[in-house]
Structures are given as structure tokens and as C-alpha cells.
């Protein structure tokens, strides 16, 4: 059975739009995962995160998987904010500058901690 025929691991609300999240999806079940560890599909409102590859060089896969999930959620927020109508990932000046998406995904836990410490949440 293909993973999209199953219940998602979770559904989240992204600016009023439900996104289904599928985690630990084998690359054999989704050809897009052959080239990446996760993606956000704005047309189907799905976030898909790959399973741990057999040839994994990372010492802490779980931490990396959480980072990939945060990264794809940032894309979902950008899509639902109206940024992403003509997204192309291989052209300079793309709709979602990957370096900024990466920065937000990496730094958000630290930003959240500071916001919580100062009572800004």
C-alpha cells in the first residue's frame, strides 16, 4: 500500500489550511525522496519526511529529522502566506530562498526559547 493511502502521522493547521504530515516514508514509496530528505507539496497540502536511509552518515538522525520537518513547515507557512506561486528550486532568485528557510528552521528552537524566557509568547 502506498503511504498516501494511509492516515497521515499528523495533521497540522498552517494559517488555516490543514497539512498532512507523513514521517519515515521509504524513498521507494515516493520518487521525490530519492533526491531529498523531505518536501512540502503546496498542491496536495502534504509534508513528507524520508525514513532513515540504510547508509546513514549522521550521528543523530532523529535531530536531523526534526530539523527537516521544521524546514518543510517553514515552506508550508510561506506557501500559505502567498509566497510560492511560481517556485522553482534551481533558478537564482527562487520564491523561497533556501538559505533563509534553512536559517529559520535551524534557529527557530533558539528563538522560541528566548521568546519564552522573556514572556513574549
At which residue positions do the language-model features occur?
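Active-site scaffold of zinc-dependent metalloenzymes
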Residues: 8-65, 76-80, 84, 89-106, ...
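A positional/architectural concept
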Residues: 2-3
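Short, basic alpha-helical nucleic acid-contact segments in DNA-binding proteins
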Residues: 107-112
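Long, well-structured alpha-helical subdomains associated
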Residues: 115-121
Amino acid at each position: 500500500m502506498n503511504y498516501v493511502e494511509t492516515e497521515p502521522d499528523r495533521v497540522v493547521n498552517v494559517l488555516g489550511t490543514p497539512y498532512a504530515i507523513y514521517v519515515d516514508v521509504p524513498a521507494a514509496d515516493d520518487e521525490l525522496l530519492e533526491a531529498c530528505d523531505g518536501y512540502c507539496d503546496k498542491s496536495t497540502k502534504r509534508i513528507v519526511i524520508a525514513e532513515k536511509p540504510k547508509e546513514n552518515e549522521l550521528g543523530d538522525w532523529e535531530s536531523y529529522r526534526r530539523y527537516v520537518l521544521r524546514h518543510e513547515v517553514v515552506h508550508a507557512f510561506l506557501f500559505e502566506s502567498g509566497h510560492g506561486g511560481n517556485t522553482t528550486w534551481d533558478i537564482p532568485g527562487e520564491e523561497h530562498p533556501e538559505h533563509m528557510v534553512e536559517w529559520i528552521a535551524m534557529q527557530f528552537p533558539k528563538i522560541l526559547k528566548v521568546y519564552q524566557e522573556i514572556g513574549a509568547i
